[in-house]
């Protein structure tokens, strides 16, 4: 997200342009990924419903998948216009075997599907050893994140002395 409403205190410690460049470098070798700069170009706060509606209008022939974490799944009803997000895409809630209770997540997904007449699904993901804040902390302490993030992003972080 280029300018998320819940992170207005520069918790990223990077600019939007830095984040965009890290993603660009990380995905350039994959034909099936494309970075959209819609949120980066916006000066105002970006809300997910606006972004998803923009994509649906710009690419009406495409079906979109919106990936969220378990924490976001349980907070989804507090988002701005959750019903509009649910109307534009399939929402995949990432399940991590080491962190989440699968049955509780499946129950919440069923509840949201009923409430919004939507398509929420469970996305079983590989267990990643570190959360993003742990990666940033490791970098701040001068540690290595080799193998934890794409090498292209790691090189950019080192070149630009980010998270220090």
Residue spans for each PLM region:
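Nucleotidyltransferase catalytic core that binds NTPs
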Residues: 1-164
